[in-house]
């Protein structure tokens, strides 16, 4: 009987020790090279998780062109992302929130997010197209696009405007 109690106590101690070391470290950044503002030369896409706790963290997405000039920056508060997913995800513990944010960083540069070209010649703009002239420019230039999500209900599609020499949103949807 004492042997069984000792064994049970040992197992509980081991389990408790494993549980207390369950801290999840945040991924700091991911980088991807991609032809975006030019059809041949690559730009640097970077997603960075800034902050130490989910309540004060932000996802910072930047694009630096092949000349080293930052051409795009979007910062999203982690709390905004977490709120958008709280209904469908169980994110009560800090470690779960950090794990979720790490997943978002890891998925940010999935191949499906890089669109070659941004708009094909047979695609037509719809109500989610904020700038129809830019959409037509993309049909002509055949430059690549990229899309990312700011939550489960908002996707933003961006591309380089050769006419305006800046990154613009060409589609925004659910």
Where are these regions (language model features)?
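Sec-dependent signal peptide recognition
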Residues: 2-9
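Residues embedded in well-ordered secondary-structure elements
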Residues: 7, 50-52, 147
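A generic structural signal for short, solvent-exposed coil/turn residues
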Residues: 10, 39, 53, 138-140, ...
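C-terminal motif of bacterial Sec signal peptides marking the signal peptidase cleavage site
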Residues: 14-17
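Bacterial signal peptide processing site
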Residues: 19-21
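Short N-terminal edge-element motif at the start of the domain
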Residues: 23-31, 36
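Surface-exposed acidic loop/strand-edge motifs in secreted or periplasmic proteins
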Residues: 36-136
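Extracytoplasmic electrostatic interaction patches
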Residues: 104-174
């Amino acid at each position: 009987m004492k042997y069984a109690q000792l064994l049970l106590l040992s197992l509980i101690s081991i389990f408790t020790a494993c549980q207390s070391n369950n801290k999840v470290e945040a991924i700091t950044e991911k980088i991807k090279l991609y032809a975006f503002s030019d059809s041949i030369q690559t730009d640097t896409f970077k997603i960075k998780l800034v902050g130490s706790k989910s309540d004060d963290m932000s996802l910072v997405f930047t694009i630096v062109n092949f000349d080293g000039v930052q051409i795009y920056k979007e910062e999203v508060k982690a709390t905004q992302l977490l709120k958008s997913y709280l209904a469908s995800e169980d994110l009560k513990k800090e470690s779960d929130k950090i794990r979720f944010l790490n997943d978002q960083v890891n998925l940010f540069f999935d191949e499906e997010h890089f669109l070659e070209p941004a708009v094909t010649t047979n695609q037509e703009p719809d109500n989610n197209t904020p700038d129809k002239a830019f959409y037509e420019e993309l049909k002509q230039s055949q430059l690549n696009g990229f899309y990312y999500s700011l939550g489960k209900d908002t996707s933003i599609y961006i591309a380089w405007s050769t006419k305006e020499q800046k990154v613009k949103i060409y589609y925004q949807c659910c």
